[in-house]
C-alpha cells in the first residue's frame, strides 16, 4: 500500500495488498483451529561472537511460525525484536525442537557438515540430528529485499516444510530443508 501511494499507483498498490492478504489468510486457515495434528516446535538463529541471536515471541517471524502451524521456542517471550541468548539457554529450550530455521550468507553450498564445523555443539540439537533444518542462503536468495512484500510465499514455504501434506506441490522460494 505504502509503495503504491509513494509511486502514485495507490489503486494498484491496494489491489496487490488485498491479493497478498487474501492468499496469506487462505494459507493461514489451513492450520487454524486445530486442523493440524501436530504443531512442530521450531527455533531460530545461530551463534555469532559467542551470542545466539534470535527474535522474540511477539515478532513477525514468531507470527509466521504460528500461522504455519508451528510453535516457536520463544513464543512466550514478550519482545518483538532481537533477543540475545547464550548457547546453554537456547539448548535447554530448543534441544528437542523439530525444526531449526537458519538464514545466512554462506559462500558455496551450506550443509550439515558446514554447520557442524561452525560449532560442533550444533550437532547435539534434535533438529540437526533428524535433518530438520530450514534454510535460506541470502547469497542466492534476496531474502530481506523481497520477503517483506511476499509474506504469503514465505508462509507457503513454511507450511510446505512443517505440514507437507497441506501443500504437496509447492515449490519453495525462500526456505527449503537443508540437504
Q: Where are the regions that the model predicts?
A:
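Flexible, glycine-rich surface segments
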Residues: 23, 27-112
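C-terminal soluble interaction/assembly domains
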Residues: 74-76, 80-179
Amino acid at each position: 500500500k505504502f509503495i503504491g501511494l509513494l509511486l502514485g499507483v495507490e489503486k494498484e498498490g491496494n489491489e496487490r495488498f488485498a491479493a497478498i492478504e487474501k492468499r496469506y489468510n487462505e494459507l493461514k486457515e489451513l492450520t487454524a483451529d486445530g486442523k493440524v495434528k501436530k504443531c512442530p516446535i521450531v527455533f531460530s538463529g545461530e551463534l555469532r561472537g559467542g551470542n545466539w541471536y534470535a527474535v522474540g515471541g511477539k515478532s513477525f517471524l514468531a507470527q509466521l511460525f504460528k500461522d504455519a502451524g508451528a510453535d516457536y521456542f520463544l513464543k512466550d517471550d514478550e519482545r518483538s525484536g532481537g533477543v540475545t541468548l547464550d548457547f546453554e539457554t537456547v539448548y535447554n529450550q530448543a534441544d528437542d525442537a523439530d525444526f531449526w530455521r537458519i538464514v545466512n550468507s554462506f559462500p558455496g553450498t551450506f550443509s550439515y557438515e558446514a554447520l557442524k564445523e561452525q560449532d560442533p555443539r550444533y550437532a547435539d540439537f534434535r533438529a540437526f540430528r533428524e535433518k530438520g533444518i530450514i534454510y535460506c542462503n541470502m547469497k542466492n536468495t534476496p531474502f530481506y529485499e523481497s520477503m517483506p512484500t511476499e509474506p504469503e510465499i514465505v508462509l507457503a514455504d513454511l507450511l510446505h516444510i512443517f505440514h507437507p501434506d497441506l501443500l504437496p506441490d509447492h515449490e519453495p522460494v525462500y526456505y527449503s530443508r537443508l540437504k
